[in-house]
Amino acid sequence: MELGIKGKRALITGGSRGIGFGVAQMLAQEGCHLHLAARSAADLDAARAKLVAAHHVDVTCHAVDLSDAANAAALARECTDVDFLINNAGAIPQGTLDTLDDTTWKRSWDLKVFGFIDITRELYARMRARRSGVIVNVIGAAGERPVASYIAGSMGNAALMAFTRALGAESPEFGVRVVGVNPGGTATDRAVKRLRERAEKELGNADRWQELLSKSPFGRMATIEELGALVTFLCSPLSGYTTGTIITVDGGACSRRA
């Protein structure tokens, strides 16, 4: 299937690892040139080397902390040519109302919630002015199915879902699309590391970590390639009538009855 996005340019925040890198791989496979933003210059350089070697596209790296609105504005000025913005940076820690302190809560929202808002504000204005562009917010399934043990993440993700729907309802007036993706459990390096640690503790062998997923849909987690493929399709003109909606990728977990 030809997606019709060869030569387009994309900015991916949190693009050096995990889901962000999965998105980068799939966009590069389609011939897109990339801007990758993340905090670690070393991780960015490693990601760039892999992408250039495999796909021969242009990859520009930006080592930046997007929890600071001024940094988001500066990044936007360096990426005025992008056709696609993929907001993916940030992770909100587990914790209940009683155990999660205000400092941790606010710091994580500065990156995951306000970080999305700040960079979107900058680039959405440019997309409106030229009447083209796609914004994909990679959010999280806890926004759809909130739990008290992940209260800050549930609330932050729900806020970003509302942000996506509101902006995506307005954006067609300006020739722009705004959509969201809610990943469930995804086999990132970080997630697998945690499962290996748990398997070592509970099963006595880290290599048995996949046994811990036996009750998950399909007995596994999503792959970063599956998430990347969806985001890439949403960026393409083949998904040109999709805006203001959220697609949940969790193997049906949010639709299950307890």
What function would you assign to each model-found segment?
Residues 120, 156, 164:
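Active-site helix of classical SDR
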Residues 9, 16-18:
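Conserved glycine-rich cofactor-binding loop
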Residues 100, 146-155, 166, 194:
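Active-site loop-to-helix junction immediately N-terminal to the catalytic Tyr of the SDR YXXXK motif
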Residues 96-97, 104-109, 212:
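Substrate-binding pocket helix/loop in short-chain dehydrogenase/reductase
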Residues 19, 145, 232, 243-258:
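Short C-terminal tail/terminal secondary-structure segment
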Residues 172, 177, 242-244:
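Short, small/polar-rich loop/turn modules that mediate ligand/substrate recognition or access, typified
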Residues 125, 169-170, 240:
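Alpha-helical segment proximal to the catalytic Tyr-Lys
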